Amino acid sequence: DNVTGVQTCALPIYKKKYKALVGEGSISGCKVILVKPHTYMNLSGDSLREVMDFYKEEFEHLLVIYDDIDIPTGSIRIRKNGSAGTHNGMRSIVRQLGTEEFPRIRIGIGRNSGDLADYVTGGFTKDEVKPLEEAVINAAYAVECMLDKGIDIAMSRYNMVYKLPKG
């Protein structure tokens, strides 16, 4: 949600289409379509498949941004491609598209020892909020950098590991 609100990537979401909320606009002079699936997470691929089919876009023009419990809170990992890992939404996307060959930005939300569903859908602690907000802002700048300078430069500038203070 928040990446679209960062000034560099401010795209209004104005349509309900393809089982998603959709916004269109421009970032760094490139036409961008933002798709926020409105399905259960494990069905995210259904929505994205419809969008890709309608716009007849190539997979290299796709960028998936998602939260990930498998990397530390506040960290960002940009990849050109790769497996879905443990993320059910990404598993759905890979299954529907039939490929892992598309770029993605993972925003780390870390993991806690409680119930996973409660953790992922619940709120974050006071110590987690600031690094997560910074990670979202950096992810937005990474999108702009990818469009301006390419994914390799974005990876070298924005792939980072954030360490929460021990407390």
Feature annotation, model-predicted:
Residues 27-32, 72-73, 115-116:
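A short, glycine/Asx- and small/polar-enriched loop/turn
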Residues 1-9:
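Single conserved hydrophobic/aromatic residue that forms the stacking wall/gate
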Residues 43-44, 71-74:
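Short acidic/glycine-rich loop or secondary-structure boundary segments that cap or lie
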Residues 67:
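Catalytic-core elements of nucleic-acid end-processing and repair enzymes
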Residues 74-86, 90-167:
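Phosphate-binding/catalytic loops
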Residues 10-43:
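N-terminal catalytic or cofactor-binding beta/alpha core of small enzyme domains
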Residues 31-63, 83-86:
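Short phosphate-binding loop-to-helix
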Residues 14, 24-25, 54, 94, ...:
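Short secondary-structure boundary/capping segments
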